[in-house]
Amino acid sequence: MEGCRETEVTNGSNGGLEFNPMKEYMILSSGQQIAVAVLCTLMGLLSALENMAVLYIILSSRRLRRKPSYLFISSLAGADFLASVIFACNFVIFHVFHGVDSNAIFLLKIGSVTMTFTASVGSLLLTAVDRYLCLCYPPTYKALVTRGRALVALCVMWVLSALISYLPLMGWTCCPSPCSELFPLIPNDYLLGWLLFIAILFSGIIYTYGYVLWKAHRHVATLAEHQDRQVPGIARMRLDVRLAKTLGLVLAVLLICWFPALALMGHSLVTTLSDQVKEAFAFCSMLCLVNSMVNPIIYALRSGEIRSAAQHCLIGWKKYLQGLGPEGKEEGPRSSVTETEADVKTT
C-alpha cells in the first residue's frame, strides 16, 4: 500500500468523480456484508450481555469486589464489554454501511478498538499472574496481592494499553511510511510494534500457566511420596487433571480466536495481500469477538463464588419483583481464599 493519502470526510474530486481511498479497504461482497452484519450483531450483543452480567454480579457483591482475583476478572469483563460494543459497531459501520469519517475520528475509533482488545489480553495476563501467585505462594498470597496493589496493576495496564493504542491518533500514521494492507492510515512499523507487544503478553500468559501446571504436578508428586498409603491415586491427581483441563481450555481458546488474525497481520507486513486474503482477515477478526464472548464462561461462570453471588442476585430481584423488597439472604458461604486456593487446600 502506498504512503499517506487524504481520507477526509469531504471526498476529493478527480475529473468530477468522487474519490475515496478508504474504499480500497471495503472489499466485502454483498453476501459477505450480510454475514458480517448478522454475525457481528448477534455475537456483539451476546458478548456484551454476558460481560455486563459478570460486571454487575462482581460489583454488586461487597465480598467479591474486595478480592483482587475478582478485580482482575471484572477488568477482563469490562474490557470485553467495551470491545464487543465498539468493535461490532465500528466493524459493521465500516464494512457494511461504508461509513467514512475524518482522519482523526477514524483513528479514534480504531484506537478504541485496539485499546479494548489490548486491555482484554492484559487482563488475561494479570489473571494468570494472580493464579500463579495464589498457587505457588499460598501462605503469603494475601500479603503479596492486596486490593491496592491489584488496582495499581490494573491502572498501569489500562494506561499502557491506551497509550500504545492511541499512538496513531497522536501522530504515528503512514505519512510518509507505507500504509498497512489491512488498516487505513496505520503504518506497517506501528503494526509490527503492536504485534510484538501482543506477542509478549501472550508469551507471558502461556509461560505463567505452563509454570502453574508444572508446579501443580510437582505438588501432587510430593504429596504422593509422603502420603502414598493415605491418599488415593485419583485424589492425588485431581489437582493435576483439573488444572490441565482448565489451562488447556484457556490456551486453546486463545490460539483459535487470536492466531488467525495475528498471523494474517504478520503476513501483511512482508507481502502484498489479495482481496481474498483481506476478506478472510475480516472474518478472522471476528474470532477476537468470539474470545470476548467465551471469556466470561471460562473465567467467571465456572467460579463457584460468582455462581453463588449470581444466585443471590436472582433471589433478590425475584423478591423485589414480587413486592417483597430487595433484601435476601446472605450471599453464599464466605470464603477467605480464591477458587485456586481452595483447590490446593482440598488436595
From Swiss-Prot:
Tissue: Expressed by cells of hematopoietic origin. Expressed in skin in suprabasal layers and hair follicles, in brain by neurons and glial cells and by osteoblasts, osteocytes, osteoclasts (at protein level).
GO CC terms, sorted: dendrite; endoplasmic reticulum; perikaryon; plasma membrane; synapse
Function: Heterotrimeric G protein-coupled receptor for endocannabinoid 2-arachidonoylglycerol mediating inhibition of adenylate cyclase. May function in inflammatory response, nociceptive transmission and bone homeostasis.
Protein name, UniProt field: Cannabinoid receptor 2
CDD domains: 7tmA_CB2
Main location class: membrane
GO MF annotation: an example: cannabinoid receptor activity
Disruption phenotype: Mutant mice are responsive to the psychotropic effects of cannabinoid but not to the cannabinoid-induced immunomodulation. They also show accelerated age-related trabecular bone loss and cortical expansion.
Transmembrane segments: 34-59, 72-92, 105-129, 150-172, 189-214, 247-267, 280-301
Modified residues (Phosphoserine): 335-336
Membrane topology: Multi-pass membrane protein
Residues where Phosphothreonine is found: 338
Chain positions covered by the region annotation Disordered: 326-347
Keywords of this entry: Cell membrane, Cell projection, G-protein coupled receptor, Glycoprotein, Inflammatory response, Membrane, Phosphoprotein, Receptor, Transducer, Transmembrane, Transmembrane helix
Residues exposed to the Cytoplasmic side: 60-71, 130-149, 215-246, 302-347
PROSITE patterns noted in UniProt: G_PROTEIN_RECEP_F1_1 (PS00237), G_PROTEIN_RECEP_F1_2 (PS50262)
InterPro entries, alphabetized: Canbinoid_rcpt_2, Cnbnoid_rcpt, GPCR_Rhodpsn, GPCR_Rhodpsn_7TM
Lineage: Eukaryota, Metazoa, Chordata, Craniata, Vertebrata
SUPFAM superfamilies reported for this sequence: Family A G protein-coupled receptor-like (SSF81321)
Gene name of the record: Cnr2
